[in-house]
Regions:
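Conserved SAM/SAH cofactor-binding pocket of Class I
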Residues: 138-235
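Mobile active-site "lid"/loop adjacent to the S-adenosyl-L-methionine
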Residues: 227-258
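Residue-level signal for inorganic ion chemistry
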Residues: 63, 106, 136, 164, ...
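Conserved Class I SAM-dependent methyltransferase catalytic core
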Residues: 253-316
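Conserved AdoMet
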Residues: 62-142
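A short N-terminal interaction module
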Residues: 23, 28-84, 95
Length: 323
């Protein structure tokens, strides 16, 4: 995961992309206002804050999109036609209360709304489960590049909200997936998100242990494990440090405890030639490479994130005759 929680970006795919809009009769039961009132409310929420309106506006517009059903394009149209009526999914008072909690207590908006747009999905999230980051979407793209033919069996270690598992399930609807999670709170959320993927089995436990019945059969394993060093913890922004689960973030003095365990079990768990693909901290590329190589994995490669940082590592289990 990233060290900091990314500001929600309203320019990304609408969170309602796969959900039909409510019928007109339902919309009429929702709070209504006019564009003029809504735009004035928006300016009021941005005014008088320690941070500049330019810094806060993306988050507020994201709240309006996901929490009220008013997307960025509609906001732009209301600038031209401010007297147009606007149906809201929440009242302005409710939205203001959420916004004030976000500003005053650093509670992530994703937790306040219980939803997080990620890739082309809308995931349920909540306290106790890590909020999926945009850069982790690249794990899916890398997996599809490195494993062009769907494997019979794949696994997601530390699935959290189930984001990676659900994305792979949609990409490979005829493959079987195994999603492992230690946290009971996260498993509860993942179970909800994975209801639409019946070919993914959710398992309780830590890393490789729940997968013992399938050791030697896994064609691909992906993982976004905790990798924050103890020394970095105090530097995390409050929304991360005070609200997101330490179990999904912290990984000992060097930040490599989880990656060390994943590397150690990979050769046994992967089928010959099976791939491991994981995310790591921005300065852990060399250390992760060393752990993977020492574990007996081959075909090591590193991959950059959207900012050009070495963020991901991939490797393969050796063929049968090399084990």
């Amino acid at each position: 995961m990233a060290t900091n929680l990314m500001t929600p970006d309203p320019s990304r795919q609408s969170p309602h992309w796969d959900q039909p809009r409510p019928p007109v009769a339902e919309l009429q039961m929702n709070p209504t206002t006019t564009g003029r009132v809504l735009l004035a409310w928006r300016r009021q929420q941005l005014a008088g804050q320690p941070r500049s309106p330019a810094d806060l506006q993306p988050s507020l517009d994201w709240l309006l999109d996901l929490g009220a059903g008013v997307g960025r394009q509609q906001l732009q149209l209301l600038q031209l036609s401010p007297d147009q009526p606007v149906a809201l999914q929440r009242s302005l008072d409710e939205l203001a209360a959420l916004w004030n909690r976000h500003l005053g207590e650093a509670v992530p908006l994703q937790y306040l709304l219980g939803l997080c747009p990620w890739r082309n999905l809308t995931l349920q999230v909540g306290p106790g489960v890590l909020i999926p980051r945009p850069e982790t979407e690249l794990l899916i793209e890398l997996a599809l590049q490195l494993v062009p033919s769907p494997p019979q069996l794949w696994a997601d270690l530390g699935t959290g909200s189930g984001a990676l598992a659900l994305a792979l399930a949609r990409a490979w609807p005829h493959s079987r997936g195994l999603a492992v999670e230690l946290s009971a709170a996260a498993r509860t959320v993942a179970a909800v998100n994975l209801r639409v993927a019946p070919h993914v089995q959710l398992l309780s436990g830590s890393w490789w242990q729940p997968l013992a019945p399938w050791w030697g059969q896994l064609g691909l394993v992906v993982a976004n494990p905790p990798y924050i060093p103890t020394s970095v913890w105090a530097q995390l922004e409050p929304g991360v440090r005070e609200h997101e689960p330490a179990l999904a973030l912290a990984a000992g003095d060097d930040g490599l405890e989880a990656i060390r365990q994943i590397a150690a079990g990979a050769v046994v768990a992967l089928r010959p030639g099976g791939r491991l693909l994981l995310e790591h901290h921005h300065d852990q590329s060399e250390a992760a490479f060393e752990l993977l190589a020492n574990a007996g994995l081959v075909a090591l490669a590193r991959h950059r994130d959207l900012e050009g940082v070495w963020r991901f590592a991939s490797a393969q289990a050796p063929p049968n005759d090399a084990r």
